[in-house]
């Protein structure tokens, strides 16, 4: 009788372990991207436009490397929205639109925070 419960318990344990790992990995990744965007914002405020564009490009490349994982574990709309925000931010940096870029970077950092929050292992997200 007890042996019958072992496979379902093992499956539940594997799901819990993956959920905890995914939550930590998502938080670490989004924190890294948000820090990169904060650095780009600081460079923009210093009016170092080539460095701003390079920092955004580097952050976008880092983001792009995680697209497969993000589309597997996150809501597609949230990931697609962040993707569009990255592209708009890079366009604003290329055009040297400081006020538009600043607003877009703030929105993008908030979107990344929400991505991490959606994947956080919590009662709110479980229910």
Located regions from the model:
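C-terminal-biased regions
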Residues: 1-42, 54-127
């Amino acid at each position: 009788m007890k042996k019958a419960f072992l496979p379902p318990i093992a499956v539940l344990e594997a799901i819990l372990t993956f959920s905890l790992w995914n939550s930590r990995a998502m938080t670490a990744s989004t924190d890294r991207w948000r820090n990169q965007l904060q650095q780009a914002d600081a460079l923009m405020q210093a009016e170092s436009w080539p460095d701003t564009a390079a920092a955004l490009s580097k952050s976008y490349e880092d983001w792009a490397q995680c697209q497969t994982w993000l589309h597997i574990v996150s809501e597609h709309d949230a990931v697609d929205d962040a993707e569009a925000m990255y592209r708009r931010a890079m366009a604003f940096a290329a055009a040297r639109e400081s006020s538009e870029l600043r607003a877009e970077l703030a929105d993008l950092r908030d979107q990344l925070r929400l991505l991490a929050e959606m994947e956080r292992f919590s009662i709110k997200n479980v229910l």
